Amino acid sequence: MRATVLGAGSWGTALASLLAGKGYTVTSWDKDAAVLDDIARNHRNERYLPGLQLPPTLHASGEVAKALEGAELVVLAVPSHAVRPVVIEAKRHVHAGTPIVCVAKGIELDTLMTMTEVIEDVLPVPLHPYLAVLSGPSFAKEVAKGLPTAVTVAARWERIAKQVQDAFHTKTFRPYTSGDVVGCEIGGCVKNVVAIAAGISDGMGFGANAMAALVTRGLAEITRLAVRKGANPLTLSGLAGLGDLVLTCSSDLSRNRTVGRGLAAGKTADAIQRELGQVAEGVRNARSARELAKRLGVEMPITEAIYRVLYEGLAPREAVTALMMRETKPEL
């Protein structure tokens, strides 16, 4: 099989390495020439996955047309804000019958579309049935190291979900299939916002009780938004919902949790992301998820609080107090 991964960041490189490790011929595309040169010459990506030796069947190209030539599987692994321009550039080179797997997690700010909605907005209608989403608790660094990981692959066509599942399945990477694309997308996007809240809680020393409450109530508001968008609520209790949320809220590998800890220490989100050298999707998603919730009439107090901390200058401690002092109500 020939596969193309659009995006050579940490996640794109980890998935490209996984596919190449199965013996597939894989081409990574990116706009960063230095990263591509490192992959092509040294079989490494020291910027995003330092210390990892990449398989010799992983190649690199800075030309979209060349990278997609003969591709039987396309993985879209760019940051959420880059999905539309990259798909616009790539659409002439993708053909019906080729599965397109989106691993970007976000809601487009201008349109409030999920990533697959953005892709469908750009691609010709005959390509829409071949879209899939891969999401779940999966840090790139651990996948690249071959540590056991389980994820969800969602597609509207069961045949496509199964095809993608088979392509990615290894002895250390186990995908489960689902037909709930929107549930997987909302879970994967909004958990990043809750993870910022988790980082704030941890950074301010609020303890385990607060963290448990935050994860539970965070899942509740993620589920409300997903269901309003047409998702099956059970999806949010699975890998793409609860699983991804727990991982991102609890691990020091989480960029979004790191942003929250930095905010608790008085840093700005911009300064924290410069230190990280990578995108923390929750910063952008806090704004778009809040706007989508307002449009759909969904109450999302944690998302609202993080938006105010990031964009209105609300002090993290005041945000916590505001959450705790909201009007009392039944849990369910």
From Swiss-Prot:
Pathways per UniProt: Membrane lipid metabolism; glycerophospholipid metabolism
Reported function: Catalyzes the reduction of the glycolytic intermediate dihydroxyacetone phosphate (DHAP) to sn-glycerol 3-phosphate (G3P), the key precursor for phospholipid synthesis.
Name of the coding gene: gpsA
GO terms (BP aspect): carbohydrate metabolic process; glycerol-3-phosphate biosynthetic process; glycerol-3-phosphate catabolic process; glycerophospholipid metabolic process; phospholipid biosynthetic process
Residue positions of the active site: 191 (proton acceptor)
Residues at which sn-glycerol 3-phosphate binds: 105, 136, 138, 191, 244, 254-256
Protein name: Glycerol-3-phosphate dehydrogenase [NAD(P)+]
Family statement: Belongs to the NAD-dependent glycerol-3-phosphate dehydrogenase family.
Primary residence: cytoplasm
Entry's localization field: Cytoplasm
